[in-house]
């Protein structure tokens, strides 16, 4: 029944990131985020011994975790006492230090340019971080800023059958593609797809008997011009609005009825005051 159904529609916005290599930011790469507290305490307490004498430090580290109320899972406990796990993050830190030395500590308002420079430095120094390692480094030295440039995920050529299939899937025209996350690049038949800022992601409940795109144009785009619909994440739900279907409206009383009631209450309260003061 369309009266009770709705589309739960995901609304995305582009990532806008600034980036900068600083000693403070890259220092955090020494530690696994899920084990930051115990790893940081161990390094600040024992220094480089965590890389050479970790086995000897296990007892003290375990006692500190217990005193600090850290209830580590078996997996995390194993990683905390693993020299290879510590070395993994030390290597990550070393890569970041090399990149900082090459790129400097300038603030970049265009993350696309910053990422390009990082990739050039990686090739120049012939280091081979995995995609996940590079992402960890980039995430550590970047942050959202609404004044920064939008971060490009990829560009895509859309022509012929590929374009027609997409337009059919989205039920839109080529001119409406930006409302679904495909933005013209300025080059013929080329579209930009931006990275999404997940913490700005929102959702809208759209009645089943209404067009998702029409709703977006009316309720979302005027307030967030750079937002778009992620149609593939759309879900269908149902709810019953008891107020809408079962509430029985009671008409307001007339002014005359209310006025006469007020006068009666005033007379009653005046008589009560007279009784209290023994004036009657």
Regions found by a protein language model. Give the residues of each.
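A conserved structural/catalytic subdomain of Rossmann-like adenosyl-cofactor enzymes
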Residues: 1-272
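Coiled-coil heptad-register positions
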Residues: 273, 277-280
